[in-house]
Amino acid sequence: MKKVSYQIVITVLTIFLSALTASSQVCVDCHKNNTPNIVSDWQLSKHSKNEVACSTCHGDEHNSSTNVELAKIPTPDKCSECHDDKVEQYKKGKHALAWAAMKAMPTAHMQPMALMEGMKGCGGCHKIGMKTESEIKELKKQGAGFGVASCDACHTRHTFSVQEAKQPQACQTCHMGFDHPQWEMYSSSKHGVRYLLKQNKTLPENTAAPTCQTCHMQEGNHEVRTAWGFLAVRLPLPDDKQWADDRVTILQALNVLDPDGKPTPRLDIVKAADVARLTQEDWQKERDKMVKTCNQCHSANFAKGELEKGDNMIKEADRLMAEAIRTVAGLYKDGVIKKAKSYTYNFPDLLTFHDAPTEIEQKLFVMFLEHRMRTFQGTFHANPDYALWYGWSEMQRSLTEIKNLAVEMREKTKKRK
């Protein structure tokens, strides 16, 4: 009886796999002519070796050039059917919230559609975030229904390679440039140089050389998060009174606190997007994880000391940033700058970015999003040149320009009176 049952199972499985193979072959035969590199990529992938057919991810409704719209575009939930643990980790981390964080920016709706939903600007990287079914439907209506899978931001289609996603270059497309040049910092730091020399075989294969993933995805954990978050602000406030005052000023300029220091509705958005650690316990958890990672090559005391230098550079950068913000806020208070219609408060709003309404606020935004970022990111990424010349030095120059421009604006206002 057991022998008969076993034979039935084998027969059913054989029929199923044969049907799966036949179904895939139909797709392959057509797409070899229309999109041949998709086919060759899939054939190189582990998917093709493990009977993960085209229909497994795209469904079987699309079967000709006349009904292309019926091809389903995979989402993380589809990937979770086989990779449940990794998708669950991803959903708990910051990457899953990237799309929501982009949409939450106060002037996101003012940007060209091609840059946002069209994924040629902000959306091109923030597409890694989770999207609702209604958002995906709307994207399709706008002709931008591709690239919603999230996982393929790192495991690019149609090879979906784990080895590719383990390389630091997998992070390079998004973690570079104006406000987050982590690639430039990492690749020219000793950490990055050692790994790149390891890649080109100058250094032996077993050389210790960390990648982005070594530090930020320990043991392959997809729940990516950092202690200081993207903007290097957190709660609770520090014991140091000056630093606490400076951080409050920055939180006010982010409109997370109002000019009186009271929480605003934007704080709820910050909480939902998990862009900052809001308890000491949450911050310490991430710090301890990082120290453990560093401890693979360095003593724990050395690692803690180096990370504390990063904390101290945030403190120093906040001193300059807060002074610049207060200078501009004073112009609002004294009526030199009139509140823009789109503004909630009579106070600068750093999250309006390049849509800031005055020249001095444009300088303030660049000081915050470019120069302050490079000051602390350069320190944490072990890149002295970025921390100093691209960060701290530029902050000093920006502060001087802002203070001088504020004096000019006040003088012009006096003359008009």
Predicted regions and their residues:
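Bacterial N-terminal signal peptides
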Residues: 9-19
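Short sequence/structural segments immediately N-terminal
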Residues: 21-417
